[in-house]
From Swiss-Prot:
Any single GO BP term: DNA integration
Entries under InterPro entries matching the protein: Homeodomain-like_sf (IPR009057), Recombinase_CS (IPR006118), Resolv_N (IPR006119), Resolvase-like_N_sf (IPR036162), Resolvase_HTH_dom (IPR006120), SSR_resolvase (IPR050639)
Subunit organization: Homodimer. During inversion, two dimers associate to form a homotetramer.
Cellular compartments annotated: Host cytoplasm
Domain Resolvase/invertase-type recombinase catalytic: 1-134
Active site positions: 9 (o-(5'-phospho-dna)-serine intermediate)
Alphabetically ordered keywords of this record: DNA integration, DNA invertase, DNA recombination, DNA-binding, Host cytoplasm, Hydrolase, Late protein, Ligase
EC id: 3.1.22.-, 6.5.1.-
Protein name: Serine recombinase gin
Species for this entry: Escherichia phage D108 (Bacteriophage D108)
Homology family: Belongs to the site-specific recombinase resolvase family.
Domain of life of the native organism: Viruses
Gene field: gin
Amino acid sequence: MLIGYVRVSTNDQNTDLQRNALVCAGCEQIFEDKLSGTRTDRPGLKRALKRLQKGDTLVVWKLDRLGRSMKHLISLVGELRERGINFRSLTDSIDTSSPMGRFFFHVMGALAEMERELIIERTMAGLAAARNKGRIGGRPPKLTKAEWEQAGRLLAQGIPRKQVALIYDVALSTLYKKHPAKRTHIENDDRINQIDR
């Protein structure tokens, strides 16, 4: 059985062209989503996937109607293949029921994986180059090393943490991370009380 799936794009909010192509291709049932592909919750696609059984074929007008990204698309088609369901894209001439269609999809998967690895490699190389130039990624530190040391001295003098946090305009939790409280245990009636110092 051929099951169709249509989804609007951000440019074209009309699915008539897709629907007509799927009807001409022989789809007996067509499921539709009227939302952008970036949304993860697509009830029409979920219903189509539930309806599909072993030996069926999921048909779309174009690849980008099904997947949000190449990685998502390859994952979805892999799940279909595991369930014994074929996939067909009309405008891209992809049909995983044929050996050539399966080969083409494997090549696409390998290219997507290679692209992902290249992005990771370039990112890591860029970060290493920045570190070698003395740049550290992320937000600049709130306080200098000298300011943190001064905050520690104020705490050692007995100034309350809340007051020190206000003076340096830092969160109390940040102050605790930089200068953890010293704990003293006092035994009292078989309980242990902890007192911050």
